[in-house]
Amino acid sequence: MLRILKLSTSSRSVPLTRLWLLQLPCFCSSSSSSSSLLSVPSDDHIVRLILDQKSASGALETFRWASTFPGFIHSRSTYRALFHKLCVFRRFDTVYQLLDEMPDSIGLPPDDAIFVTIIRGFGRARLIKRVISVVDLVSKFGIKPSLKVFNSILDVLVKEDIDIAREFFTRKMMASGIHGDVYTYGILMKGLSLTNRIGDGFKLLQIMKTSGVAPNAVVYNTLLHALCKNGKVGRARSLMSEMKEPNDVTFNILISAYCNEQKLIQSMVLLEKCFSLGFVPDVVTVTKVMEVLCNEGRVSEALEVLERVESKGGKVDVVACNTLVKGYCALGKMRVAQRFFIEMERKGYLPNVETYNLLIAGYCDVGMLDSALDTFNDMKTDAIRWNFATFNTLIRGLSIGGRTDDGLKILEMMQDSDTVHGARIDPYNCVIYGFYKENRWEDALEFLLKMEKLFPRAVDRSFKLISLCEKGGMDDLKTAYDQMIGEGGVPSIIVSHCLIHRYSQHGKIEESLELINDMVTRGYLPRSSTFNAVIIGFCKQDKVMNGIKFVEDMAERGCVPDTESYNPLLEELCVKGDIQKAWLLFSRMVEKSIVPDPSMWSSLMFCLSQKTAIHVNSSLQDIIQS
């Protein structure tokens, strides 16, 4: 058994590593004599010193050292601090030894605070049997375990296994004559909610009511959160109506849940009720409401929500403000976004890198590339460090906007930047797309070749696919492409272009359409030289109407068809003698300011020649007028 109090009181017994402590004012007597006795340290000082130790041995050493002071007797507080450190380092045998010694050392048994500390220590170590055994440990000292001890054990058990916790509640707590309080039921509700046992949660709520324990807001909110997490927001709303005193957390849970389901009306109704009861939702909830409003294009209403929260003393942060900036940018209202940006600074919500990135993206989307570059340069002036998203957004915008050479300059800056670590292929693919869009095929291939040092596997796969598109078999091509995708690779626009042509030539139109959809999803609009191959593929399969619809779809997506887009369709219709559809298609083409080439005139004239002279003259007159 350890003996704490019978250690030598000589200052020479103080460990060398602790001698500096003797110089602390709190440990020195007021006498200037070198032979004066040291004053007795307080419990708080010793507790702090024990808790500051970085090892179990250090904590024990400090504890023993404190015993060397004449007149100092350890208290429950110092023992509790030592138990905490010993539990942190899992010295549980020493904990038991010191517990046995406590009554003799200080004349007092351990109290609830000490037992709770030990329970939590066992819990952190996941020693569930030892956690439960604390009940017997308390009884060993002739003390009846208190409700606080039982609740502490229960709190550990619900995090580990709700079934063990329920069994403990029934067989230990209730069998000992301990009646749970609202905190007890709150712990059980937490365990049931964590395991999504919502039905049992409602049963527990009913047991509380019949037992005369009124559920508080914490109990209700725990069950509400579980309901919302499982998508049962309507049932959560009904449960909320039972609450006599919902609090701000209640509204935060339900408003956020409705926002997650994009149910704007319900979230706004609850927001109004929240305000009317004098509550202000937290900044996370406010941001979610604003985000849903902005997604619906109702940015002005989102601004009103923000201003109401501010006027009621609620907290607003830069993330909430960024939501508005993003909303304005999505609507193309860049001047308003810029004004709000300035207002953010005036109110003390300092813009961060995300704010600037949103503005850059917004300017790029509306074609204001010079403003995007100015914002990029402002970041350096305002001491905002560029990150990968900054570079990637600007390179993408410049490349898509027809300024690939400027995008290349930004790419070079990114390569030299110390804020971007590790090469990522996205901005490089953006540059390739820029070359593709500007019909600079040689530059695109040369750039792809230069990428080999940074992305050897991706470049090797790309050239292999391009080669297979030229002269390989379809099975080999599919295998190589699937392998690239399986490895997480993203094909460049050059690879996609080649694949679309090869698939379309071999009648695999569905595969071609998937590639085009993938391009559009990534923001890369294919040129007519790419999607014309699909149109020819439709015509070969005698699916002219599918081809016509495809052209219309591509035009709606922002792609620009050309003469070669309509030529195979018109020719196929004319061969079939369908003059009405041919003429309608020809008219649509002319309306889009696409000038027909000689072959199209020939096809149309051939088709007309099959009709009567009167019909031919009438149609020719319509063509001339067009």
From Swiss-Prot:
The entry's keywords: Mitochondrion, Repeat, Transit peptide
Gene3D superfamilies according to UniProt: Tetratricopeptide repeat domain
Superkingdom of origin: Eukaryota
Protein location: Mitochondrion
GO cellular component, as recorded: mitochondrion
Pfam families with a match to the protein in the record: PPR, PPR_2, PPR_3
Transit peptide residue numbers: 1-66
PPR repeats: 75-109, 111-145, 146-180, 181-215, 216-250, 251-281, 282-316, 317-351, 352-386, 387-421, 424-454, 457-491, 492-526, 527-561, 562-596
InterPro entries in UniProt: Pentatricopeptide_rpt, TPR-like_helical_dom_sf
PROSITE patterns assigned to the protein according to its UniProt record, in alphabetical order: PPR (PS51375)
Family: Belongs to the PPR family. P subfamily.
UniProt protein name: Pentatricopeptide repeat-containing protein At2g17525, mitochondrial
Organism, as annotated: Arabidopsis thaliana (Mouse-ear cress)
Lineage: Eukaryota, Viridiplantae, Streptophyta, Embryophyta, Tracheophyta
